[in-house]
Amino acid sequence: MAFYLGIDIGTSASKGVLIDDRCNIVCQASCGHETDNPRDGWYQHDAEAVWWGDFCRLSRELVVRSGVNAAQIGCVGLSALGCDCVPVDTECNALAPAILYGVDARSKPQIDELLSEYGPDRARELFGHDPCSSDIAPKILWFKENMPEVHERAAKFLTASSFLCAKLMGRFTVDRYLAEDFLPLYDRYTWKVDARECDRFCRPDQMAEVMSATDIAGVITQRAAEATGLVAGTPVLVGTGDSGAEAISTGVFRPGDMMVQLGSTAYFIYLADHMVDDARLWPGTFIIPGTYGICAGTNTAGALTSWLRQELYRDAVEAEGHGGPDAYSVMAHDAADVAPGADGLLCLPYFAGERTPLNDPEARGVFFGLTGRHTRAHMVRAALEGVAYTVASHVDIIEREHGLPIGRIMLVGGGTKNPIWMQAIADVCGREVSVAKVTVGACFGDAIMAALAGGAYASWDELAQVLGVAQTIVPDMTAHELYASRRHIFDELYTRNRDLMHELV
């Protein structure tokens, strides 16, 4: 029997899973890590300690705990947080801390500079959307303007999955799904490096080779085998972003399917059979050939509940440390006792700026409507509903503005542990949402892609047969009517206060 390994590196934690050739989970493991926040608006990782360190730790743990002979692992799949950037030397040693995705706003001056230089129309044409803090080209420009020696020394500018793949087998690659984040440095039709556009940002030779996520990029080197506990010669996939792998893990394979990932941030992928043009979102190719993804993302989801836990539920955190119930379960229980609508309390969840559809790194969080009768439970409920409103705004753009049918919405990520949150999303959107049978996340998507590439399945359709739905949440339409009646307040809170938010920065 062959086994397949999948490892995903996330914002605050990394996960790994080992499956057999029928996609049954044999063993899983996880580990946490810190995200550095050295300055306001800066979020970064030590790529060596966090990305590579977590990968090695998890691969070794999975092999040892499972009792599987590493030689039986037929293929390795990997993913990691996307839209990040680390400069490396020829041996794939990181030359500086990795700048993370859209939550890191340090490249805003470069974005403003590019918008001024190109003009908004040309900028949208080049980037495929309004340039934002999730784009990697402005991050490369930040290195050029703020760390010129590092920029000059860099052999490549990589995203996290590319970094891991290079560590494992010594080849610098990036999959098409993540190459979109590097636009305009690649020609999006040929996926060759665009030397003319690179001139503004970096040398053409500093860009990785574009391949498909499910291509076998190479095999594990002896050096990597010693670090990971795997066997030299084991095939390694090119890898992809965590969001794409997570969508795969839920069975989001076909046009009309939509994934809502509730992690530290929220991320959305809607699959279409054609390219869709919308400058507010991130349209592009998807992992599966012949499909296109409308991608989008917010800057806060679980990060907001984490903040509430830390600031308003310190007693529950302390009790948890002494053997009491999990603090998040206490928060969920409290929120369940508050009626939909949180007794008139609304939350704009823009606590780290906002990505789509606002594309405003200077947006700020708001609790609106507070009165003396409100409690911390109301604030938790309002925060969950605030994130649900952001989900609904993306559903509306896809269905109402673009006229694209959404067949099903699959929820995935840590937020699926909170039934109140899932119900709020169903109620605000006014439609059913489902949870996959396997909710391990992106690492499971990595493993099943490894199984496909390794020959355990002949096609995506065959692979889909072994994946299923565990739960479907039906909307309460009375609650939906209440949320719909307040939707304009949620929307106008931002538009009316945007300029004031910017004055605070």
Predicted regions and their residues:
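Short alpha-helix plus adjacent loop in nuclease-associated cores
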Residues: 100-117, 447-448
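A generic structural motif
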Residues: 32, 101-102, 299
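Conserved small-residue
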Residues: 16-18, 23, 76, 104, ...
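N-terminal glycine/serine-rich phosphate-binding loop of ATP-dependent small-molecule kinases
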Residues: 1-97, 125, 153, 222-226, ...
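Short beta-strand-loop/turn "lid" adjacent to the catalytic site in phosphate-handling enzymes
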Residues: 64-102, 130-134, 161, 165-186, ...
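Active-site core segments that coordinate phosphate-bearing ligands/cofactors
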Residues: 5-6, 115-128, 138-173, 183-201, ...
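A conserved helix-loop-beta module that forms one wall/lid of the active-site cleft
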Residues: 201-214
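Pocket-flanking alpha-helical
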Residues: 86-88, 109-113, 246-248
